[in-house]
Amino acid sequence: LCADAVRSYTKNRLVRTLSPSVNLLVGDYAASNNIEDLADQSEGIRRIAICRMDVDNLGQAFIAGFEQPDQTDPVQRMKYVNLFRAAAFSRQMSLFFKYHINSLLQGLCVSIVYAGGDDVFLVGAWNHTLQAALRIQKHLRSYTCGALTISAGIALFNEHYPIRAAAEQTAALEDEAKKLPGKNGAALFDAV
């Protein structure tokens, strides 16, 4: 590369500008980067909640989402199954989990640890984290015209509890929620 080369990046900007910059979409909403501050914002019991969410049956949606099952002719049945539609679908999912999620969480005392692809990892004041999960579920349902659902595992912890251990316990709850008939559920505090 030449010494004069400059790389320019923008974050979460959907409008193109004249400058040749690379736009990065990042789900990075954070009410605070301090877990104790998040716990201070909880109502009633002073606890944080960890929430892990994952879109249900997304792999199946990619495989069969564009197939026309009512068509008997194989060519007509697979007419809309192509790489371009799958790529557009993937972009729309990324847009939801890396861009729209930031505005959905505004005003809540939660912070995104990870959001992208089809899953979310949040930490926050326990009551705000529950609200965040409900907002995400409601808006994803609307965003996909009711075609996709999401399951969640949510657990409460003392703010000094190790995040890694909390994440593993919450992942187990998320797995339990995925076992529900029809999915689209939540496993809370060791209860499905």
Predicted regions and their residues:
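Regulatory/sensor and coupling segments of signal-transduction and defense proteins
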Residues: 1-192
